Amino acid sequence: TGAINFVAGMILDYRAFDTFGESNVLFMAVIAVLMLLQRDKKNIDAAEDQEMQEDEMLDAEDSKLILKKGAKCLAPVVILYGIYVVLNGHLSPGGGFSGGSIIGAGLILYSVAFGHKKMQTFFTIKTLTLTTAACLLTYCGCKSYSFFTGANHVGWEVPKGTPGAILSSGFILPLNICVGLVVACTMYGFYALFTKGEV
C-alpha cells in the first residue's frame, strides 16, 4: 500500500469499500436525524419562539466569559491537531476517523462557547450536506479506478511515492481527508440538531 501505518493501509486500501460503506452510514444517519429533528421555522408556537430568543440572549451575554476566552485559545489548537492527525494518518497512528472526531469536538467547543448563530456564519446545513456529499463522491471516485482497470489493480497502479513522505501511499491520504471531513461534519451535525434543532 505504501503506507507506513499498517492499519491505514488495511482500512483504506484492502478494506476500502467497507470503510466507504461506514462513511455512507454516517451520512445517512445525519440526514435521517436532520429530517426527524430539524426545527420547522414556519411552524413555531409562542413558547418555542420565546425559548429560542432566550437562548440567543444567553449566547449574546458575557456570562460565558471564561468559556469564551478558553475556547478562543483552545478551539483552533484542537482543530489544528485534528487536521494533523488526519494528514498523518498514513504515517503514524490516527487517520480520518480519529482526526475527524477531534475536528468535530473543536467545532462543538466553538459552538458551545460562542453560540449557534455565530457558528452558522460559516457552518450551515448547506455546508454540511455539500461537504459530506463531495467527500463521499471523491472517496467513491478514488476507489472506483480498480473497476476500470479490470477490478484487479493490474492494469494501472497508483504511484505510491516515497514511504514516510506526506505525499505517499497513493490514495490513502485523500481518503483519510474525506473520511475525516465526513466524521467531523457528522459529529457537529448531530450536536447541533440535538441541542438547537438546526445546523
Predicted regions and their residues:
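Individual transmembrane alpha-helix segments
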Residues: 2-34, 169
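Juxtamembrane interface elements at the cytosolic ends of transmembrane helices
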Residues: 7, 20, 30-58, 190-199
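Hydrophobic cores of alpha-helical transmembrane segments in multi-pass inner/ER membrane proteins
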Residues: 26-34, 105-111, 175-189
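Membrane-water interface at loop-to-transmembrane-helix junctions
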Residues: 53-74
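Membrane-interface helix caps and helix-loop-helix hairpins in membrane proteins
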Residues: 86-95
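Alpha-helical transmembrane segments
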Residues: 112-127
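Hydrophobic alpha-helical membrane-insertion segments
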Residues: 128-145
